[in-house]
Amino acid sequence: MNATVVPPYSGHWLTNTDRMGGLAYGIGVSIGILMLITTITLTSYYCTRSHISASPTTTPRTRRRQRESNGTLPPGQERFDFEDDESDTVVVEVLGLTEEVIKGFPKLPYEEARVSYSLQKESSTTSCCSICLADYKKMDMIRVLPDCNHLFHDNCVDPWLRLHPTCPVCRTSPLPSPAMTPVADVVPFSRRPMMDI
């Protein structure tokens, strides 16, 4: 009779070949996943980098010039761009208002602004500046934004308007829109003859 002799279990992981195969499999899968993540990351980096440098005709400066020639740059707003000697272009877009436009908004002492503008309607900007959250004092210089009549300290709202072309509270643009034509001028009123009954 042929009897196979099975060695007794020693309990040590290095002598057990089944456990050794499981460990090798786990290490192999971990290394494979790590290599896959690295490959995807490097490939996406190089593809993005080559895509940016492959299209020199659509630089931000070219797009800015196209927008300016189309007339999409609103009046009273500025854009600045800086170019270095290398092939990279740095564009800084400042969409705020020009200094001339900002200085054109009413600026007066708080006492006068409160009487002239704020008593018409009670709002959150009548007693304190929404930017610095400080209460207005009688002699504080206040800038009043047109259309919404919100009040702000002039030294608080002027830097805001240089960067943003809208009111900090309601986001209304203080600039007149380019297409402000009354409807009556475009479509005349139609008149129906009145019928006596």
Curated annotation (Swiss-Prot):
Chain ranges passing through the membrane: 20-40
Cellular component GO terms held in the UniProt record: membrane
Pathway, per record: Protein modification; protein ubiquitination
EC number: 2.3.2.27
GO MF annotations in UniProt: transferase activity; zinc ion binding
Subcellular location: Membrane
Example GO BP: protein ubiquitination
Reactions mediated catalytically: S-ubiquitinyl-[E2 ubiquitin-conjugating enzyme]-L-cysteine + [acceptor protein]-L-lysine = [E2 ubiquitin-conjugating enzyme]-L-cysteine + N(6)-ubiquitinyl-[acceptor protein]-L-lysine
RING-type zinc finger span: 129-171
InterPro entries, per database record: ATL71-like, Znf_RING, Znf_RING/FYVE/PHD
Predominant cellular place of this UniProt entry's protein: membrane
Region described as Disordered: spans on this chain: 53-80
Keywords linked to the UniProt accession: Membrane, Metal-binding, Transferase, Transmembrane, Transmembrane helix, Ubl conjugation pathway, Zinc, Zinc-finger
Topology in membrane: Single-pass membrane protein
Family that this chain belongs to: Belongs to the RING-type zinc finger family. ATL subfamily.
Domain free text: The RING-type zinc finger domain mediates binding to an E2 ubiquitin-conjugating enzyme.
Protein name as annotated: Putative RING-H2 finger protein ATL71
Organism: Arabidopsis thaliana (Mouse-ear cress)
